Amino acid sequence: MAHDNREPREVKNHLLFEVATEVAHRVGGIYSVLKSKAPVTTAEYGDRYTLIGPLNHQSAAVEVEELEPSNPELKATIQAMRDRGIGILYGRWLIEGAPRVLLFDTKTAYGYMNEWKTDLWNVASIPSPDNDEETNEAIVFGYLVAWFLGEFVCHEKRKAVIAHFHEWLAGVALPLTKKRQIDVTTIFTTHATLLGRYLCAGSVDFYNNLQWFDVDAEAGKRGIYHRYCIERAAAHSCDVFTTVSHITAYESEHLLKRKPDGVLPNGLNVTKFSAMHEFQNLHQQNKEKIHDFVRGHFYGHYDFEPENTLYFFTAGRYEFRNKGVDMFIESLARLNHRLKTAGSKTTVVAFIIMPAQTTSLTVEALKGQAVIKSLRDTVDVIERGIGRRIFERSVKWHEGDPLPEEKELITSQDRVLLRRRLFAMKRHTLPPIVTHNMLNDHEDPILNQIRRVQLFNHPSDRVKIVFHPEFLSSANPVLPLDYDDFVRGTHLGVFASYYEPWGYTPAECTVMGVPSITTNLSGFGCYMEELIENSSDYGIYIVDRRSKGVDDSVNQLTQYMFEFTQKSRRQRINQRNRTERLSDLLDWKRMGMEYVKARQLALRRAYPTSFNGEEEEDFIPGVEQKISRPFSVPGSPRDRTGMMTPGDFASLQESHEGLSTEDYVAWKLPEEEDPEEYPFPLTLKQRTGPGSPLDSIQGLQLNGTR
């Protein structure tokens, strides 16, 4: 945080430190954010970008290559801390972009813990109970980061320094940086609020009562008051406060008592998922693997046709209410009733992929796959025998001889072998609803909800259900598919979340060309709703969970799924094409520009004299541009003359100047494979809206001109 009595630092070639507890250590979603964003950030900053996190020896051993710092100021800072007994690993993170990382061994600083806890109380009035190991780790890590930043700016006196913190676990350093007047400018991004996650997990009408919560009392009742204090202090101590979505910004304004300066949506490394023209073939290949599982799981009751079978799924952390699993199961029951009433021949197999406590795979699940494998092996043997006999009979054929008959081709031995396999497929029980033995079967919320709505995989049911309480893996003996391959093989992802600050699962569906259902309480759902008119035409269905009652929302979700079952195969193929072409909307090359704007705003606030003293309000506010529905239904989104932006960071002037595809502001959707098939251009609806402080710096250059 800069001060007027100090010489302004050089902002043009500023340094960037990004601080999080998941650097080179997978715990949750922030790891995915940092890893997927790294190529874009390193391309912009090069060796001026360093990630800071706590050292996890196990993951660092395989993810980090140790190096000597080339920057003399950084080298001097690290040495000064090592001289005081602090363990530090500096090196290259072995991911795309190869960013530099600085990892602190927090265990080497635990001797300072009591001193630092006392100081934290004196500085920020934040209590810290002894028995909360996660908070203890956050405090030690926070003090090490503040120590490092203070030491570093004493060595580096020329260049401006930006420190960007993610989540409360990395946020302890923020009030310390402000109190000590360390000459860095800071950004804090909350990916979800502590209190929001706790409140939503209970039976609370969260969003309609946000302004009425006594936040201190609610945090105290849940035993997280000290954590909430850290999060709130971080939000109020930073120069620029951001969240990952507008819905989380609304939540943060009421729970953390500061209105965010802007929104930094999560992007994806679209190249990782890119399959170009192959994605339809990949869908077919992986769908066939899911067919194999379904044949085994439902053996003895497999009376539905693969071509009339649709695969729906939901996946994520096991948060029964927050992830909307309760609504998904209830909607499946209503969908089952509607399909049976309509006399539909379509069968829906719904998968729930959520890791829970299990002991082993069920005997029934293993037996089903073994029975089908035996049947397939037997049929292969018989098939080869028939082929050989047809060939031998044909070689000896003379004019006037009859064609080979069935009795000559299938031997009595073949018939006995086949009859044995068919008798082995007899089943006197219904196919199981879960693939594993659960640790607490009778207390599991998902299983109890399935039992309540009586979705027991009965032959008359048009909706079947499979709960797979384990992460997917190609090494799984029952469902041998990695998650990405499984998603490609399905037809529809359903994520009816009640609390979802962003939502990577529907975003991943989009870039893989799989339609999805989300809600307007998820960050991703809000983002796409603002960006696209009639988003369902592009394979993104948005359920209203904010203004509708629970029953109405369930009915809306049921209606979306029912409408999807009525689509023809050709309509589903066209919709997948449109969905996949939205990938560029979610690429970090576009989303990353919001991070650029946040950093520029932080520099302007810390070093206003470097920007000719212009006020934030003097800059052009944002313009929101919407992608309209496609003229052709079914069809594909395309663009002949207009520009599209993933956020509200392009001005009207820029969008009419015909900026190229490579320009960071404007972009075009990929061209059609057959441009002549659809003669109409994609039109954009433009509507001006209030800008955020981040919008004000869109045309800003470092010398203060526009």
Curated annotation (Swiss-Prot):
Alpha-D-glucose 6-phosphate binds at residues 277-278, 280, 283, 287, 491, 572, 576. Pathway: Glycan biosynthesis; glycogen biosynthesis. One of its GO terms (biological process) is glycogen biosynthetic process. UDP binds at residues 26, 317, 505. Pfam families: Glycogen_syn. Coiled coil: none annotated. Its EC number is 2.4.1.11. Allosteric activation by glucose-6-phosphate, and phosphorylation by a cAMP-dependent kinase. UDP-alpha-D-glucose binds at residues 191, 197, 317, 500, 502-503. It catalyses: [(1->4)-alpha-D-glucosyl](n) + UDP-alpha-D-glucose = [(1->4)-alpha-D-glucosyl](n+1) + UDP + H(+). GO terms for molecular function: alpha-1,4-glucan glucosyltransferase (UDP-glucose donor) activity. Belongs to the glycosyltransferase 3 family. Interacts with glucogenin gnn; the interaction is direct. Glycogen synthase participates in the glycogen biosynthetic process along with glycogenin and glycogen branching enzyme. Extends the primer composed of a few glucose units formed by glycogenin by adding new glucose units to it. In this context, glycogen synthase transfers the glycosyl residue from UDP-Glc to the non-reducing end of alpha-1,4-glucan. This is Glycogen [starch] synthase. It comes from Neurospora crassa (strain ATCC 24698 / 74-OR23-1A / CBS 708.71 / DSM 1257 / FGSC 987).
